[in-house]
Amino acid sequence: MGAGIAGAMTALHLARRGVRTRLIDRWEPGHSRASSTDYNRVIRAIHGRDEFYTRWARESILRWMELQAETGQKLYYQCGALILATAGHCDWEDATADTFTRMGVPFYRFSPDEIAVRFPQFDPTGISYALYEPEAGMIMAHRGVLTAIDLFRKAGGTVDRGHVMTDDKERLMLDGKPLEADLVVIATGPWMGEMYPRTIKPISRVVGVNVLYTSTPDGSTQFDQDNMPCWIDHGQGSFGIPSCEGSGVKAAVVIPDTIDLDKDERLIRRETLNRTRSYIRRRLPGLVGQQVVDSKFNQIALTPDTHFIVDWHPVHKNVLLAGGCSGHLYKHGPVFGDFVAGVGMRDYGTADRFKIAGRKKLSPKESPSGR
């Protein structure tokens, strides 16, 4: 249930294991309500001290490249990722550097002066240093979902439209009728909390992220993915992606926003427009005066520790809950789907970090997302 990246990749891996699989979503695959929507996503191994996600990210890059070679679809751009460490608040970046050193992940550390020379798009004011991961980059998000679903169909799977809900005992209903199957994987993203108000909602908070795309300057390639990396700027609550395939430069200042998933329109807030332009003036001065050419409203399901959810329902033993993206699941999609399929087929148990019970807030150094 759910045809975003988590559901699509899980369905694909189940089908490739020879399991007769049906993928159901309320809307057309790739629809704009999903957390997996938008043109692109950052893929990077940078996860603080967390070696688990670092390994998964490195493996996921290879898996995305394999899918790209298999299908001929351009899914991955290796433009690198730059992590800007704010002076006085560098715990997560310090921990990442230690993790990369232990695990042999290639990276560079740049001083503010070196940032200004190597990446002149950025004003390094207030930055202590930056970590640059050259093997990171971006995944084409919308294309990635549609590619996974196309491969799923070719593997013998079926894709259907339907509305899945639960009753007051959290039993599944499809279009108003009881849903029965040997295995049901619930990968409905932010809707999972509404479907499971007792089991999931206490550990899953839905927040909105407003994203702007700004035009690159006339005649300039400085802000294209060939010349500029993706970046994360925790001190400013921001992240971004260079222009790719004509998108414009993606920049987001994360202002946690509430949303009614079924009633609210996916429109950005005026406050976000002003905050993002203010950020661009400070950090990306070469974009000052350029027009906003596109915008997206994305929602994420945020868990207290920003770990994913992959666990069996405590009562309905054939229901496997898979999600809790916390803003960093998409890039792990191929590995996540393979893992969930294995748990669903009971080839192995889930990881302790993915269990529903025992969730707690982590410090920025411990958190895999730095949140």
Predicted regions and their residues:
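Glycine-rich Rossmann-fold phosphate-binding loop(s) that bind the pyrophosphate
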Residues: G2-A6
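Active-site substrate-recognition segment that forms the wall
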Residues: L12-R17, K74-Y76, P190-N318
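Glycine-rich FAD pyrophosphate-binding loop
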Residues: A15-S36
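Hydrophobic anchor at the start of a short beta-strand
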Residues: T21, F107, V184
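Dinucleotide-binding Rossmann-like beta1-alpha1 core, especially the glycine-rich loop
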Residues: N40-R118, G237
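Flavin (FAD/FMN) cofactor-binding and adjacent substrate-gating region
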Residues: E66, A87-G156, D160-R161, D167, ...
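Predominantly flavin-linked oxidoreductase catalytic cores and closely associated redox partners
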Residues: I139-S220
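C-terminal catalytic lobe of FAD-dependent flavoproteins
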Residues: Y279-R371
